Amino acid sequence: MPKIKILVTPYVVKNKPETERNHVVTGVADGWEKTSLNADPNEILTESKGLDTLLTDCNLKPDGVTKIDPSKPIGKEVEIEIYDPDAIPVQTVTVSPDTATGTVGQQLTFTADILPADATYKDVEWSSSDEAKAKSLGNGVFDLKAVGTGIIVSATSIDGGVIGEAELTITAAVVAVTGVTLSPKTKTIAVGEKFTLAATVAPANATNKTVTYTSADPATATVNATTGEVEGKASGTVAITGKTADGNKTDVCNVTVS
């Protein structure tokens, strides 16, 4: 059943007649002292200022009441469960998507489908099996904070605690390449001489730093596409280009073969 929250107040409210108890408002307040109206020290029948409005919103009337223990700190929050015998209960909760993958720093949104469609209380509470990696922000929104697999996202109905689940995988955030710089920028070599280009990809923490090399004139100088090793073949000048796999960023080294 749905739960509401009230603040503890020192008011004492008189009990209503037993004949009016068609609904029961119950709640757990561990550590509360037993009173004359409590069958169990951890169970309370309560009514307090502000509670009437909340019950009215649920189309219920407050019934049994008891003394709010004045020895407890004023402002202490107590969760109250409302029992409605006429409610149409939730039978299933289905979370969509049932599997999802996201990256660190992203926010993903899930939805919960409640059956039957005319269930009285359709609200759900969202949670994850690892809040340090996937933190629930409410309303099915999760903040992805760290890499993880097999994380269970749950939607629990406030009526009956029916649970729907989805599985979430979180991968490292992709850091895009913004540029590449070849070194040296110019080079003079003899025929048959070799040297290897160095490529610096920016930013330093880019996810994919792969660079491919090409020669504008292989007859003058060749280059190994993977390693960047250049070899002079004939006299002349040739441009050797390095291009990143991510973003197609380029830089050029001008090679003179003498």
Curated annotation (Swiss-Prot):
Q: What is this protein called?
A: Ig-like virion protein
InterPro entries xrefs? Big_2 (IPR003343), Invasin/intimin_cell_adhesion (IPR008964)
UniProt domain BIG2: residue ranges: 89-149, 176-253
Q: Where does this protein reside within or beyond the cell?
A: Virion
Q: Sorted alphabetically, which Gene3D superfamilies does this protein's record hold?
A: 2.60.40.1080
Q: Which UniProt keywords apply?
A: Virion
| Pfam families attached to this UniProt entry | Big_2
GO terms under cellular component: virion component
Q: Which SUPFAM superfamilies match?
A: Invasin/intimin cell-adhesion fragments (SSF49373)
